[in-house]
Amino acid sequence: MKISSGAINFSTIPNQVKKLITSIREHTKNGFASKITSVKNTHASLNEKLKTGKSSSIEFALPQKIKDFFQPKDKNTLNKTLITVKNIKDTNNAGKKNISAEDVSKMNAAFMRKHIANQTCDYNYRVTGAAPLPGGVSVSANNRPTVSEGRTPPVSPSLSLQATSSPSSPAEWAKKLTDALLRQKAGETLTAADRDFSNADFRNITFSKILPTSFMKRDGDIIKGFNFSNSKFTYSDISHLHFDECRFTYSTLSDVVCSNTKFSNSDMNELTLQYSITTRQQPSFINTTLKNTFIRHKANLSGVILNEPDNSSPPSVSGGGNFIRLGDIWLQMPLLWSENAVDGFLNHEHNNGKSILMTIDSLPDKYSQEKVRAMEDLVKSLRGGRLTEACIRPVESSLVSVLAHPPYTQSALISEWLGPVQERFFAHQCQTYNDVPLPAPDTYYQQRILPVLLDSFDRNSAAMTTHSGLFNQVILHCMTGVDCTDGTRQKAAALYEQYLAHPAVSPHIHNGLFGNYDGSPDWTTRAADNFLLLSSQDSDTAMMLSTDTLLTMLNPTPDTAWDNFYLLRAGENVSTAQISPVELFRHDFPVFLAAFNQQATQRRFGELIDIILSTEEHGELNQQFIAATNQKHSTVKLIDDASVSRLATIFDPLLPEGKLSPAHYQHILSAYHLTDATPQKQAETLFCLSTAFARYSSSAIFGTEHDSPPALRGYAEALMQKAWELSPAIFPSSEQFTEWSDRFHGLHGAFTCTSVVADSMQRHARKYFPSVLSSILPLAWA
């Protein structure tokens, strides 16, 4: 019985076979525009054969488009192809299981895979790892008997993919991968062949340009289960992608940009992995193997799976190279330890945290033996390079930051070589940071450098007192660093006890002021005066201060107080009222000098002094006024008749009728860049200048308890009056303004102490416009 393709009569065919033919027809017409041209039964009635359990054959002809894939000699044998249906007994559409579209697709794809790959090979296909195809269906070709024993080939690709030629360019490979990923993203289950990109060529491909942005996002889409074995990624950019359960065996990833690329649960054995210099953020390897893989020295291997190395030879690279083993990984080493090689391979502090030291150390502690062996090989190489101290000097910090920690301290070879390096590093730290603040310690410094410095002070206890500036900073950061371990804090506290017991220190701590007031530090509060710095010039002089004060003086802000400490001589507290902070820091405690001077240069009060008292006309007075700003109290007083007269001669022309002259007012605006400022901003500046001149007239500077220079009082009041005219809103109230004005002039029985006025005005400015006050008021008066 022959039935035309346009009107196939399915009435005599069981339901399962109907579904099979319909599915094959639907599946093939999309890929190859093929049509089933005939369906016929053989010698006996199809229904009769199905009833008796015998095999029946349904024949359909392959379209010409498929035949064209085969050699001419094989084409004649492909005219007829059988789909054999075995042991289908149910003719009443009540079979236990119909043939699914998925099973039909697999059958059809298996048929095409075998014929395209082998052309004349017959086989019996079964779904890998599953039960036989429904209804006992198998696929055969060329009218040959089917093989009764089922084999288990790899999961086969879809018909459409295998029936096309392989991509011939990186762009075509990129398109093929994009198509596969989009299908997978859409929910389609890809076969192994769909995910087979072995021998692919992705050279110079920037994946962010071909893939949806969702693949580059954190916790975005994942490239999962793909086979990239023996593929080329040279000069490609795979940044921010996540490859999971992928295979890269024997692939080449040379000069590849892989910033923040994630490889998880993947096979990356036997490949070349060389990052491009434009890789800013290291890739990560999670539960990934790198057996015999060649890796450059800048990598993070925290999630790598190491195994015992085999006897394979080191990889060969262009230009040659030296290598060391890290477990079963090959790490690149320089051919020669030149200056550039030392910096590039060892100086992670100069190379964004990347070096061969950090690469080895990035492995988890369970690989301690492998890490130590690799570091020993590195040290042997350095020792063999006969590097000079000058060559090692720039990388001393990087070396001790890794090698001075466990597990490398357990190696006698490493410790012997590192000892002199650590000594030179410590000497340089003492020389550099005893008189200047340490850089603000980040996590790296707290966890890797501070413990090394503690160990060095422990070995050289004399340095605690000879370099107390550095020692106190180290203890400070160990006790306050949020990333310091408890072990580091405990060791720091123990070392400080040794320091306090030193004869040069102990006389200063039994005065009822130190720590918990009985001579012991109190580490439970940052307000306790636990720190004691020795003078760099006078062994009898020391400074006692709290944790908070020490921190703020080392890293000051405009509001930092520079007198919140005890100055001790022979253990006794002495007044700092008439001591210039800048001179004290320059002579005795230089660790604060740079920070103090930096803040002082931001104070612009001196510009008004230069306007009023030019150095050409009033050189001596100018020096006296400037010198007074460097201390809280002045021994120079300007209340004698000659001084009062001289000051009146200078200030009276600036204050016609007791108010600022227009010309002088414009000079002030110009000096402080306020010409185009708002009235409120001008008023705030004038208010703060008034505060400073009120201080000049007080008993603390040029006045006494009973008298003060009238010209300075009048000038301070004139500045305040102008501020009121410009913006009354900056004052507490009109009543407060009137009270301050009366105090300046002694009117209405007001108390005339300008120290009280200066303090009151200063408190108000600090509360409502602190930045303006901090830009003007001298540090010693703050």
From Swiss-Prot:
Q: Where is this region: Disordered?
A: 140-170
Gene Ontology process terms (BP):
protein ubiquitination
Listed EC numbers: 2.3.2.26
Gene Ontology terms: cellular component:
extracellular region; host cell
What is the documented function of this protein? Answer: Effector proteins function to alter host cell physiology and promote bacterial survival in host tissues. This protein is an E3 ubiquitin ligase that interferes with host's ubiquitination pathway.
The yes or no answer to whether the keyword Heme is present is no
Q: Which UniProt keywords apply?
A: Secreted, Transferase, Ubl conjugation, Ubl conjugation pathway, Virulence
Name the enzyme's class: transferase
PTM description: Ubiquitinated in the presence of host E1 ubiquitin-activating enzyme, E2 ubiquitin-conjugating enzyme and ubiquitin.
Q: Name one Pfam family in it.
A: SopA_C
Q: Which SUPFAM superfamilies match?
A: Pentapeptide repeat-like
Instruction: Tell me the compartments it is located in.
Output: Secreted; Host cell
Q: Which family does it belong to?
A: Belongs to the SopA E3 ligase family.
Record field: catalytic activity: S-ubiquitinyl-[E2 ubiquitin-conjugating enzyme]-L-cysteine + [acceptor protein]-L-lysine = [E2 ubiquitin-conjugating enzyme]-L-cysteine + N(6)-ubiquitinyl-[acceptor protein]-L-lysine
Which one of the record's GO molecular function terms can you name?
ubiquitin-protein transferase activity
Say if the entry is tagged with keyword Kinase. Answer: no
Question: Can you tell which superkingdom this protein's organism belongs to?
Answer: Bacteria
Where does this protein have compositionally biased stretches of type Low complexity?
157-170
NCBIfam families the UniProt entry points to: PRK15377.1
Q: What is this protein called?
A: E3 ubiquitin-protein ligase SopA
Q: Where is the active site?
A: C753
Which InterPro entries does UniProt cross-reference here?
SopA-like_cat (IPR025725), SopA-like_catalytic_sf (IPR038270), SopA-like_central (IPR025726)
Which coarse location class applies to the principal site listed for this UniProt protein?
secreted
